[in-house]
Amino acid sequence: MTSHTTPRIYVACLSAYNNGYLHGAWIDAAQEPWAIYDAVRAMLAASPIAAAEEWAIHDVEGFGNLRIEKYASFERVSQLAVFLAEHGEIGAAVLDHYS
């Protein structure tokens, strides 16, 4: 039996982080890039630091051994996540082999 984790990213508010707060959100990465962007904007709007604008990807789940950079484009994150959501562990192994 294979385990399946929906690819997701933890995006942190850097303004909050730099001021001693841990504020961020786990976001489903297997969606359109604009939807990821909207979720990040909502997370920033709820930040304990007013007018927060900067973010970074601090953690990922469901991407196998693939490395997701902290400033990876939402388009790239979305493409990888959609592929992995569709193909699971075998898809992760293929991507890992060719990266």
Regions picked out by a protein language model, each given a short descriptive name:
Residues T2-A46:
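N-terminal ordered "arm"
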Residues P33-S99:
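Structured domain cores in non-transmembrane regions
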